[in-house]
Design a protein with these regions (language model features):
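Conserved, mostly hydrophobic/aromatic
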Residues: 41, 123, 200, 309, ...
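Boundary at the C-terminal end of the N-terminal hydrophobic targeting segment
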Residues: 18-20
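Aromatic- and carboxylate-enriched substrate-binding clefts and catalytic-loop regions
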Residues: 150-153, 158, 163-169, 175-176, ...
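Catalytic and substrate-binding clefts that recognize carbohydrates or anionic sugar/phosphate headgroups
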Residues: 34-275, 279-300, 306-311, 689-707
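Short, glycine-/Ser/Thr-/acidic-enriched flexible segments
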Residues: 51, 128, 205-207, 214-216, ...
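Generic recognition of flexible, low-complexity loop/linker segments
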Residues: 24-25, 108-110, 186-189, 196-198, ...
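Carbohydrate-binding surfaces of carbohydrate-active enzymes
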Residues: 308, 351, 355-356, 472-480, ...
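Bacterial N-terminal signal peptides
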Residues: 4-14
Length: 708
């Protein structure tokens, strides 16, 4: 037994999609009772009998394993525990430990600092080929708050497994959820359409935890045992997938944890300045009699948007072309404009460009169409379709066949990247709204993908692979002057894309039911959930993807989206104040609100762009209130207000009929953005009036932010 080892170690890693991790100078001390790893003020201690780990910062415990059991693995349904440390060997940045197990054989546990604040722990069970799950248990005091994991408010059953894999709560949102996830179980298996996930959470105790890999897993956040946070993940066939690897990040502040996390998994992409203008789009630009724009017949819905913007004095921004605008099956069979729907595309795009619009278009890794020249036909002939039942390629929301691209196949990646690049190059379209990527993905253990992984490994990996293909297509044409916005995300996806929050409800039951304000409520929470996840730039379909039926919901959502990472206005049905689904149809009050806040978005663009530059280190544009002062416990779960950048405090309204609310001001001094004459001291609650055209916004005293 080695009981006296001291060493200095340096480790330099370059994870996929990440920059080089900074070297960690680590002092390792091994005694008969404890193994200590010291990286400046951060210390990892491993008790030897039985093995128990804890992480400390300046002598204060941030997190520790449960006393009655920490690391574990499962074989044939039986949970096996680790015992005493037999041997300790120095490795770069830390130690490798031989550990007894209750099977009588030896497991290997490696503990090492990747940076001065990132500790990696790896468990390799004995005979790993026979292991079906691995996990960890951590002590959770009752005052701990846990943030992150998903943007979705909570896990709920899907509507019809294998057919409509949508969470029931997404379609009919309940009034549940907040920032704090404590007391929940959260499954790590991406379900559409609120599909920003990561096996990563942050704790109010001052640490973060991220689990490596893409296999399915479960976080039990002190639900089964009020004193324990546990994680359990499946293993897979590859040797590297038959072990548990997780990283602990020492804060204590949330910004530091995000910096460490994104340094490991990949720095988030920051799009060009123009992407922070407001976006205009429709779920469908309808086929019909064209209208004239600059003397050329174009799609009438598009002409209506452009000409009404000019007539009403609404600033130009980003115009997005959603599916269907190209030809064939599902409106997406070939990268070729459907000129029945979209006549004179060159002239149309020139008219938009003259007015200052940038343009984006819909895409997904769906191989549609079985006719000559269709992408589905070509992909199938090349062997690029994902595993599963074979039939003629047919894209459909329900009942489609053979249409998912095998994004693990390098040939398929290159082929699709080049097709996308050719189209955006030809038409100068500088962005893609990347849909799906988590829907209808073959995800069974019997689904073997091109790279040898099973569907249970690929489902969570698909968003990143899909995003990288489209990122590379755009980058090959435009350098860094493009935007990619996606719906699904898992570890590393934000390195390639920014995000929007899925098919959010302005009305229930896929838009067939009654109107609701709970979709807006969920968007307010989801944006902040994403912020804790290392997803710094996020937006939502203003008014709801499923058509709003109450004008107040649209008004309040416009106000909220002005202070979101992305302000995008569109969805199913009409989202135009001059053509409302409510009365009056031509709604002057709504026109004034729409114009006021799209203009304000343009006014605030320099401030937003400056805040966005911090996103490269993981700092979100929208910052949940715990970011403001982690010592002020009134902020721990205050979800209905947030910081927008460093100096604006925003308190959105989501309830229909609400005309007043309270706002809690954190420490410091604050001024009303709308009436800056009065300075208010922080750590107090103020009551504010909120007429329909007003959202409460406060400015940090002394900050320089352009006024309304």
């Amino acid at each position: 037994m080695r009981i006296a080892v001291a060493a200095l170690a340096c480790l330099m890693l370059a994870p996929s999609g990440a920059g080089a991790v900074q070297p960690a100078k680590t002092r390792v001390q091994v005694s008969a009772r404890i193994v200590r790893l010291v990286a400046g003020p951060i210390v990892a201690e491993v008790r030897r009998t039985p093995l128990r780990l804890r992480l400390l910062a300046r002598g204060k415990t941030l997190v520790r394993e449960q006393s009655d059991g920490g690391l574990f693995y499962e074989r044939s349904g039986t949970v096996h525990e680790l015992g005493a440390v037999r041997d300790a060997r120095w490795v770069d940045g830390g130690v490798q430990l031989d550990v007894d197990t209750d099977e009588g054989s030896i497991a290997t546990v490696t503990v090492r600092f990747l940076t001065r604040r990132t500790l990696e722990v790896e468990l390799v069970p004995p005979d790993p080929a026979g292991v079906n799950a691995v996990g960890e248990r951590l002590r959770s005091p009752s005052n701990e708050h846990i943030y992150g994991l998903t943007e979705r408010l909570r896990d709920s059953p899907v509507i019809r497994p294998g057919v409509l894999d949508f969470s029931q709560d997404d379609i009919n949102p309940p009034e549940v959820g907040s920032l704090d996830r404590r007391g929940e179980t959260v499954e790590m298996r991406i379900i559409p359409t609120f599909s920003v996930y990561a096996p990563f959470y942050q704790s109010s105790l001052g640490y973060g935890l991220s689990v490596g890999g893409t296999t399915f897993g479960l976080f039990d956040l002190a639900k089964s045992d009020p004193s324990t946070v546990s994680v359990r993940f499946e293993t897979a066939s590859a040797p590297e997938a038959r072990r548990l690897v997780f990283d602990l990040f020492a804060g204590p502040d949330y910004a530091t944890i995000l910096d460490e996390y994104t340094n490991l998994v990949g720095r988030p992409i920051v799009p060009p300045d123009w992407a922070f203008q407001h976006w205009r789009w429709r779920d469908e630009l309808r086929i019909g009699t064209p209208a004239m724009l600059d003397g050329v017949p174009v799609n009438a819905d598009l002409a209506d948007d452009v000409l009404m913007y000019e007539q009403l004095g609404i600033p130009a921004g980003v115009y997005h072309f959603d599916r269907p605008v190209v030809v064939g099956n599902y409106g997406f069979a070939r990268w070729e404009w459907d000129t029945t729907r979209m006549p004179n595309p060159d002239a149309m795009l020139a008219s938009l460009a003259r007015r200052g619009y940038h343009t984006t278009i819909w895409s997904g890794a769906w191989m549609c169409g079985s006719g000559p020249g269709d992408d589905g036909t070509e992909a199938q002939a090349l062997g690029y379709i994902a595993p599963g039942p074979v039939g003629p390629p047919n894209c459909a929301d329900v009942g489609g066949t053979s249409f998912i691209l095998d994004v693990t196949n390098p040939g398929a990646q290159d082929w699709w990247r080049d097709k996308v690049a050719d189209f955006v190059r030809r038409y100068g379209i500088q962005g893609i709204k990347l849909d799906r990527g988590e829907e209808h993905i073959p995800s069974q253990a019997t689904d073997i993908w091109a790279d040898g992984r099973t569907g249970r490994e690929v489902l969570n990996a698909y968003p990143t692979l899909q995003a990288r293909i489209h990122h590379d297509a755009l980058a090959s044409v435009f350098g860094d002057d493009f935007v990619l916005i996606s719906r699904p995300s898992y570890t590393g996806t934000p390195h390639w894309s920014i995000f929007w929050g899925g098919d959010i409800a302005g009305s229930t039951s896929f838009g067939l039911g009654h109107g609701t304000d709970l979709g807006l409520r969920s968007a307010i929470i989801s944006q902040q959930r994403a912020a804790f996840l290392g997803v710094p730039i996020w937006g939502s379909d203003t008014g709801g993807y499923y058509q709003f039926t109450d004008r107040e919901v649209f008004a309040r959502w416009i106000e909220f989206s002005t202070f979101s990472g992305v302000m995008e206005i569109g969805g199913h049905g009409t989202h135009a104040p001059w053509n409302m689904p409510t009365q009056p149809n031509y709604d002057q009050e709504m026109i004034d609100i729409y114009r006021r806040y799209t203009t304000l978005r343009a006014t605030l663009q320099p401030y937003i762009v400056t805040a966005a530059r911090e996103a490269a280190g993981g700092m979100p544009i929208v910052r949940p209130m715990p970011f403001a002062d982690r010592r002020d416990h009134k902020l721990d779960d205050l979800w209905d207000q947030f910081l927008f950048g460093p100096d604006l405090l925003v308190a959105p309204i989501w309830k229909i009929g609400q005309r007043e609310r309270t706002v809690y001001l954190p420490r410091g001094k604050w001024r009303s953005y709308w009436d800056p004459s009065k300075v208010l001291k922080g750590r107090r609650t103020v009551a504010v009036s909120v007429p329909l055209d007003m959202i409460p916004v406060f400015v940090r005293d002394g900050a320089k932010v352009r006024g309304p």
